[in-house]
Amino acid sequence: FLGTINLSLCEQERDADEEERRDEPDGSNVEVEKRFLSHIAGFLSNLFGK
């Protein structure tokens, strides 16, 4: 029962996110850049032992 509710809420959030992305075509690019930069920062941090 709780799994069904959780799945339903996740679907609603995903639908809301997709609607926002349609409203702002550049919004998805910003998200990709943020993820990419965070991965690069993590890699450099591990590389230099910080």
Curated annotation (Swiss-Prot):
GO terms for cellular component: extracellular region; membrane; other organism cell membrane. The modification Phenylalanine amide is found at residue 48. Keywords: Amidation, Amphibian defense peptide, Antibiotic, Antimicrobial, Cleavage on pair of basic residues, Fungicide, Immunity, Innate immunity, Membrane, Secreted, Signal, Target cell membrane, Target membrane. Its main location: secreted. Residues 1-10 form the signal peptide. InterPro entries: Frog_antimicrobial_propeptide (IPR004275). It is found in: Secreted; Target cell membrane. Expressed by the skin glands. Residues 11-35 form a propeptide. The keyword Secreted applies. The keyword ATP-binding does not apply. GO terms for biological process: defense response to bacterium; defense response to fungus; innate immune response; killing of cells of another organism. Amphipathic alpha-helical antimicrobial peptide with potent activity against some Gram-positive bacteria (MIC=4->80 uM), potent activity against fungi (MIC=10-20 uM), and no activity against Gram-negative bacteria. Does not display anti-leishmania activity. Does not show hemolytic activity (LC(50)>80 uM). Belongs to the frog skin active peptide (FSAP) family. Temporin subfamily. This is Temporin-SHc.
